[in-house]
A protein has these predicted regions:
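Conserved, carboxylate-rich catalytic/transport cores that coordinate ions
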Residues: 1-419
């Protein structure tokens, strides 16, 4: 039995209230390094709707029953009041998972975490076998000193503790989605269409050029097979990026079309109404259902607006990261680095450095005594004079020569190919 309890934000944010209108306008919270621009006031996001230890909180609970193989045996969702016994951090739980010890946790908490860890793995394996695509890409982690000065940029991967919560949230979202379908509730769905044919063909050509055999790329299982081919290779993270870029964008809509990346027919966002407006609408639809109130129909424009706000937030987050990376690398001008090729375009090569974790651009003109040909049909670069094909993940030595502050871009010059 798995219970996922989510703060009942809809109790405090009433439909058409000034607070609701502002939340709809923002659409989402924006997470930047070192700060957050919340969708809702902090009196809600950090207090009344924050699940604090030893305090009663209004929640909606998704109660799910499974067998030992992760098959669903029953589901119900209902309003609830919970009191948090202990508020754990990802760091604390990860230490416990890695060492088996944590002096902060009592024995009952340790037993619950051990049980949850095993069951989350069962759910994940079942989901992957169904065709959910299992990406594992690093994100930049910015390190600040006590005075707020940026002192490092590192690779950060999703921890096992994070994956545990992710699996439980995915399950709750999907089962609430099935319930909303059965009850014909008006909600915003999280739709993810399959990749466009042209994108698939370009990806297949890229895979062929890497001397790999691409599967048909018709289902998520095909993409997982491709990821398995490059598991543990230097090109693995860059192939994952290429796969991700070949995907269509997930968007919100008032009509359900399914989620390709999760191989889910019924999928919506239920678990984060504090930071996502579509989740808040799902909570409202559930309350209307329990109260036998006619629920307001949701127009297509509402889904478009939510998708637009999400896209704007992601652009803001990405450009802020690039700005911080560019400013941080000022101290490294003229320094040589070992890098990997992470991508190409007609003008040059994108290179990625592991530490500090940054990406930059090396124009073809920065490689002396060489001419390059970029074939956008086959997505490969050929050095004509040396007759070498450049590959994703290939090592190269570079020097940081310029910081383009207007475009937040790092420019590198070539030193040597490093095979």
């Amino acid at each position: 039995r798995l219970l996922v309890s989510i703060a009942d934000v809809s109790h405090y944010v009433r439909a058409s209230s000034p607070l609701d209108k502002e939340a709809q306008r923002r659409g989402t919270s924006v997470y930047l390094p070192g700060r957050c621009i919340p969708m809702l006031p902090e009196a809600l996001s950090n207090e009344l709707c924050s699940l604090k230890a030893a305090q009663d909180r209004l929640t909606l609970t998704a109660e799910m029953l499974f067998d030992s193989k992760g098959n669903s045996l029953g589901f119900k969702v209902y309003p609830s009041v919970i009191k948090v016994r202990a508020r754990l951090t990802y760091e604390q739980v990860e230490i416990f998972f890695q060492t088996g010890q944590n002096p902060v946790f009592d024995p009952a908490t340790c037993d619950l975490l051990t049980l949850s860890r095993g069951f989350a793995q069962v759910l994940r394996e079942k989901r992957n076998k169904r065709g959910a695509i299992d990406f594992s890409l690093p994100e930049p982690r910015f390190e600040w000193d006590k005075n707020g000065v940026l002192i490092g940029i590192h690779q950060s991967f999703q921890s096992e503790a994070m994956k545990l919560i992710e699996q439980f949230m995915l399950e709750a979202n999907e089962q609430v989605g099935l319930f909303c379908t059965e009850q014909k509730l008006p909600v915003l769905w999280r739709n993810h269409p399959p990749p466009l044919p042209a994108k698939k063909e370009a990806l297949k050509q890229l895979i062929w050029n890497l001397n790999l055999k691409p599967p048909p790329l018709e289902t998520g299982m095909d993409y997982n097979l491709l990821l398995a081919q490059v598991q543990g290779q230097e090109m693995q993270p860059f192939i994952q990026i290429a796969l991700l870029r070949s995907m269509s964008l997930a968007k919100y809509g008032n009509r359900r079309t399914g989620h390709f990346g999760l191989a889910a027919e019924y999928y919506l966002h239920f678990t984060s109404p504090i930071r996502r407006y579509p989740d808040l609408l799902v909570h409202r639809a559930l309350h209307d259902h329990w109260a036998n109130r006619p629920a307001a129909k949701l127009g297509a424009q509402l889904g478009d607006d939510a998708s637009d706000r999400e896209a704007a937030a992601k652009i803001c987050e990405r450009e802020t990261n690039r700005l911080l990376q560019c400013n941080f690398m000022t101290a490294y001008l003229g320094q040589a680095f070992k890098a990997h090729i992470s991508g190409f375009n007609r003008a040059g090569i994108y290179v990625e450095i592991a530490e500090p974790y940054v990406e930059g651009f090396m124009p073809f003109s920065a490689v002396p005594n060489e001419r390059f040909f970029f074939d956008d049909q086959s997505n490969q670069v050929i050095a004509k004079r040396s007759n070498r094909k450049l590959r994703l993940g290939e090592k190269v030595q570079v020097i940081l020569t310029k910081l383009d502050q207007e475009r937040n871009e790092l420019n590198f010059s070539w030193v040597a190919w490093d095979r």
